[in-house]
């Protein structure tokens, strides 16, 4: 992926308008299939995230299949040199977003969206990335929170790069800096080091 990125960057500097290199990563993270632990790769995101100049590579980690196309269209509209989608297994049932209090799937195009908004003063913020951990949060944690657990904001990271591409005002509107003071992150990928 690095060589196509260098080639695309050079071509654009020379006035040529090359196409984006699409590096499809299939269903990555721990629960990738019925035998998930035998062919999972939690390191894969680390190989492409933060290893390119800003804007040269966009990754997406949708939580559900209905987020894939909006994320893809948004990512490709920014014309990155490399587009690296990590998609979920199509057999996952769609969550009832309205019942859970989650944002509509189209909000994934912002890169970060709410799975749950605190009803009052939030006791904290949970930021989730990766469909494996995300599914556990949707199926087990959100119902428990809604049934009387701590009043938390829960956000999902569908694309760090798309979120970072937003204007600062929009960025701060979705995830205000003060929320980060009480935030914890949950991911099923190994973070870049």
Question: What name fits each language-model region?
Answer:
Residues 1-12:
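Long, structured ligand/cofactor-binding scaffold of large enzymes
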Residues 63:
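TRNA-recognition modules of translation machinery and tRNA-sensing kinases, especially anticodon-binding
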Residues 16-21, 25-46, 52-54, 59, ...:
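Thiamine diphosphate
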């Amino acid at each position: 992926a690095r060589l196509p990125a260098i080639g695309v960057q050079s071509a654009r500097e020379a006035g040529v308008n090359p196409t984006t290199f699409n590096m499809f990563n299939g269903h990555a993270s721990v629960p990738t299939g019925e035998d998930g632990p035998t062919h999972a790769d939690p390191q894969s995101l680390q190989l492409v995230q933060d290893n390119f100049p800003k804007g040269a590579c966009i990754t997406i980690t949708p939580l559900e299949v209905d987020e894939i196309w909006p994320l893809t269209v948004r990512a490709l509209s920014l014309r990155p040199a490399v587009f690296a989608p990590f998609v979920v297994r199509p057999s996952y049932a769609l969550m009832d977003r309205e019942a859970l209090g989650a944002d509509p799937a189209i909000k994934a195009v912002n890169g970060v969206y709410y799975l749950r908004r605190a009803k009052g003063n939030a006791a904290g913020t949970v930021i989730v990335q990766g469909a494996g951990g995300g599914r556990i949060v949707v199926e087990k944690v959100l119902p428990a929170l809604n049934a009387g657990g701590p009043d938390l904001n829960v956000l999902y990271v569908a694309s760090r790069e798309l979120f970072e591409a937003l204007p600062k005002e929009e960025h701060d509107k979705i995830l205000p800096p003060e929320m980060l003071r009480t935030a914890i992150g949950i991911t099923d990928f190994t973070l870049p080091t």
